[in-house]
Amino acid sequence: MTNISLDKLVTESRNENTKNIDRVETLEMLKMINNEDKKVAEAVEKELIHIAKAVDKIGEAFLNGGRLIYVGAGTSGRLGVLDASECPPTYGVSYDLVRGIIAGGESAMFKAREGAEDSKKLCIKDLKNINFGKNDILAGIAASGRTPYVIGGLEYANGIGATTISVTCNPESEMSKIANISIAPVVGPEAITGSTRMKAGTAQKMVLNMLSTGAMVKTGKVYGNLMVDLKATNEKLVERAKRIVMQATGSKREQVEKILKETNFDVKLSIFMIESSLDKIKAKEILDKNKGYIVEAIKEIS
């Protein structure tokens, strides 16, 4: 365990605005919580410069064969797993590109294993099990900024020369001093004292959304604001794929359906084929040459 006293942590402080939350009507109780939640986006906004640095590093790592690995315990670990699990269906990437590791393993997603967070060695073992290397990025998540499991991972990653990021909600935390890039939205005391699944968890989720989304945009997974590498694995996504191609090209549904069928529902390739009027083989050749960036591929043929 670290030596930082809990009573010195912002996330463990008592919130003066909600001291009587147990004595008010339901609507007033919810207003109290909502008023606290309003502070989250502003706290994240103050960290945008640091988030941008992290996004650039992650995007660079992706282009050079690296991965983004989240580590955390409890709520923080679950948020990392959640963000990572959404990347493959949304952006068509492998399940290995963005991974979430939670202290205590997969079972900790559904049942708290709080003691697992106290071991530095456990995180090092978990990272070695996935062959974490110097080309990867490690993002350690902990509201307190003092979780031994995460600190162990950050120290290990630093030791092998990997880029490290900390996502905390306490200023000047131990994690922020260890990581190469510190992201620390200070959301203040929770509505329920110490319940960091609330404001702190919301802030962390917003930051993780930015990290993964920003990196995917930087690596050509988005055209305009359309997710052009999604995998059409169910009926909803099949329809979304059609809409995306229609929106990107202004084409009629009939033409879009024909092209998507020809490309086996490769949304990006379908868009470029329509925009370039090239056949599938030539369009794919130019897209691959431009590393999947539609904008760059269009520039080449203009």
From Swiss-Prot:
**Could you tell me which InterPro entries the record lists for this protein?**
Etherase_MurQ, Glucokinase_regulatory_CS, MURQ/GCKR, SIS_dom, SIS_dom_sf
Enumerate the UniProt keywords alphabetically: Carbohydrate metabolism, Lyase
PROSITE patterns hit by this protein? GCKR, SIS
Name any Gene Ontology BP term. amino sugar catabolic process
Name the catalytic site residues: E86, E117
Answer whether the UniProt record assigns the keyword Lyase to this protein.
Answer: yes
Which reaction equation describes what this protein catalyses?
N-acetyl-D-muramate 6-phosphate + H2O = N-acetyl-D-glucosamine 6-phosphate + (R)-lactate
Where is the SIS domain positioned along the sequence? 58-221
Q: Does the keyword Metal-binding apply?
A: no
- Name the pathway: Amino-sugar metabolism; N-acetylmuramate degradation
EC number of this enzyme = 4.2.1.126
Give the Gene Ontology MF terms in alphabetical order. Answer: carbohydrate derivative binding; carbon-oxygen lyase activity; ether hydrolase activity
Summarize subunit and interaction data from the UniProt record for this chain: Homodimer.
Hey, which family's this protein in?
A: Belongs to the GCKR-like family. MurNAc-6-P etherase subfamily.
Function of the protein: Specifically catalyzes the cleavage of the D-lactyl ether substituent of MurNAc 6-phosphate, producing GlcNAc 6-phosphate and D-lactate.
What does the record's miscellaneous section state?
A: A lyase-type mechanism (elimination/hydration) is suggested for the cleavage of the lactyl ether bond of MurNAc 6-phosphate, with the formation of an alpha,beta-unsaturated aldehyde intermediate with (E)-stereochemistry, followed by the syn addition of water to give product.
Q: What is this protein called?
A: N-acetylmuramic acid 6-phosphate etherase
- Write down the species: Clostridium botulinum (strain Hall / ATCC 3502 / NCTC 13319 / Type A)
Taxonomic placement: Bacteria, Bacillati, Bacillota, Clostridia, Eubacteriales
